[in-house]
């Protein structure tokens, strides 16, 4: 996994002292992507490998989500999936999770399946869905990528953390088919809580990226930051546990078949 690119971030604290930030409403509109397919007669989808061998990034050459939503993720077994496209992709054996970025889709698979069999099906489902003008989301997720919008109630340190994530860290993470979500800052311990999403969530090098990449950059520009930790939502922990049980059953059945 690539580390976030280091870009000039001079006079950060001075800039925030002079800058005024307006409060941001959490309200949003349900996304119905009519605009994205009005002029499309044929869609050309390309795929890119990610640092996570179990995740592929698919780029259809059009915006999947509007800026008001940013990104959203669905995992097998999480319950309600407010995405017709994600529901279709989950019908493919082996699909573990679906991540929608602004203009890309990251599909993650279980360790016991092969892309050679899955990839053509994924291409077909995405192509058919987008070509028909079907909505990507049936309603807006409860949590979007508005985590780095600077609020009037944010402290100067939190505002700087959000700005650095949005301008320097997030673009590099998205290149790898994932995203990073700001979950909070504990001023007493200097701990930044982040959630890795998409291809980065299950990548074997995610811990290295978190500590040697993101943490190093935040500590360099913001001395108040002492540590960066990854967090999971309760429903995500349950979904991961259930999928691991499912994979264990599949692998167990394969071993029994091989021993016969």
UniProtKB/Swiss-Prot annotation:
> Could you tell me which residues belong to the region NifU?
161-231
Can you list the GO cellular component terms from the UniProt entry?
A: mitochondrial [4Fe-4S] assembly complex; mitochondrial matrix; mitochondrion
Q: Which Pfam families match?
A: Nfu_N, NifU
Q: Which organism is it from?
A: Schizosaccharomyces pombe (strain 972 / ATCC 24843) (Fission yeast)
Which GO annotations describe the biological process of this protein?
iron-sulfur cluster assembly
Gene Ontology MF: a single term = 4 iron, 4 sulfur cluster binding
The record's section on InterPro entries has: FSCA_dom_sf (IPR034904), Nfu/NifU_N (IPR014824), Nfu/NifU_N_sf (IPR036498), NFU1-like (IPR035433), NIF_FeS_clus_asmbl_NifU_C (IPR001075)
Identify the domain of life. Eukaryota
> SMART domains this protein is in?
Nfu_N
In Swiss-Prot or TrEMBL terms, this protein is called NifU-like protein C1709.19c
**Which family does the UniProt entry place this protein in?**
Belongs to the NifU family.
